[in-house]
Design a protein with these regions (language model features):
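N-terminal interaction/assembly modules
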Residues: 1-136
């Protein structure tokens, strides 16, 4: 697993924990740093801050283009994977679009239901197609 893949996984863990505990992701990040000797990779912090900053717009896009699913009905882990993937796809120019989608699908394969990778791939693929108009 590459350093960036590990950073994505760590960011996912922190974002998921924050939502489950109903705390700010930055508060969860701070608690994680205080609890463990593990250094949180700078890219994990970038993801967390990016998802927080762009979260409303990301959720709007996900809600608009997910077919048959509202954000509230999605499994929480899928919701976090999609938020990370959408942030990388739409707002992080350092990550190629295909990599953003592929990495999100891999997280879904490792951590979610059997149907989740297909759902994540389809929704992020749709956002990738619409990217020029979404950010215009």
């Amino acid at each position: 697993m590459s350093a960036r893949s590990k950073a994505r996984r760590r960011a996912l863990d922190i974002l998921f924990e924050a939502e489950q505990r109903s705390v700010s992701p930055l508060e969860a990040l701070k608690a994680r740093r205080e609890k463990t000797d593990t250094v949180v990779a700078p890219y994990s912090v970038d993801i967390i801050e990016g998802v927080m900053t762009q979260g409303e717009q990301i959720d709007e896009f996900l809600g608009t283009y997910s077919q048959g699913w509202t954000l509230d009905r999605m499994p929480a882990v899928d919701r976090m994977i999609l938020r990370i993937g959408a942030w990388e796809l739409l707002y992080n120019a350092d990550v190629p679009d295909g990599v953003a989608v592929s990495e999100a699908v891999e997280l879904a394969k490792m951590l979610s239901t059997d149907e989740s990778p297909t759902f994540v791939n389809g929704l992020l693929g749709r956002l990738q197609q619409l990217k020029p108009t979404l950010l215009a």
